């Protein structure tokens, strides 16, 4: 549910599973020189084998961009238009841009003849199109699977990417940092405190429901948060569900977690107003415990177009910092 605050608004604005056999790679074979010749792994669609070294890599899943960039993986084509400016690939003119999911330039993938396409998230719908355009490419999809724990699914994705690109140690470090951040929040959070998650966008505040809400919903399962409000028939809408500011005020959450959706896509727009202004300048919310006590915690600005494991690690640590400071 989404509501428009009484004062001028702002713009603002994740599901994972347990590591299973799906994330275990088979031993890599080697050629006569001792170099890796192939790697076998499992994704959402089954078992795949890739010949190595890889000569052409394409990426369209925004949850993977930061990881691939941090590992120095060269891309021949990617959904560059979808990337936040925080991703180094946006400065590499040699990468062919496949565009946004709303207006994709899929045919351009043919020119780079990819060995592998890391596909998913907003581009998941184009799996079959890629398969027809470049039938020899291995299409990897590691989106969090429905019904599986979101935190474990983020780690599974990282683990499999590590297997594909020979970055197992780096993947283990990312997962360990993620786990450590989760432990910090678990240690700092009190079940007596109620929590609400919202997405701000276009001057309105959207409700991100426990479990199912976009980006922040899974946190209620990861941390067993006590929900300040639980509305039936909630959705995964990218702007959150409609809700009245009065309903939020009446639920009186002790903590409000915020994704500023527009921070990722409209930060340079002169009409953009930060999500903090939407919430903290709302007269209707001025009496809410979370607002009075400064217990509003914001996700990183690039969250809406990033959403990778690093995004959550950073946010969990910020949340832990805030909660520890209140203890």
Region annotations inferred by a language model:
Residues 113-119, 135, 248, 252-257:
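Proline-aspartate-enriched helix->loop->beta-strand connector
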Residues 189, 202-208, 221, 225, ...:
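Ligand-binding pocket segment of bilobal, Venus flytrap-like solute-binding proteins
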Residues 82-86, 209-239, 302:
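Alpha-helical, coiled-coil/dimerization segments enriched in small aliphatic residues
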Residues 2-63, 168-198, 259-271, 321-327:
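Bacterial Sec-exported substrate-binding components of ABC uptake systems
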Residues 254-327:
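Structured C-terminal subdomain patch of bacterial secreted/periplasmic proteins
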Residues 55-108, 116, 122:
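A short, structured surface patch at a secondary-structure boundary
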Residues 43-45, 98-105, 234-243:
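Short helix-initiation/N-cap motifs at beta->coil->alpha
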Residues 135-203, 295, 302-327:
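Extracytoplasmic substrate-binding proteins
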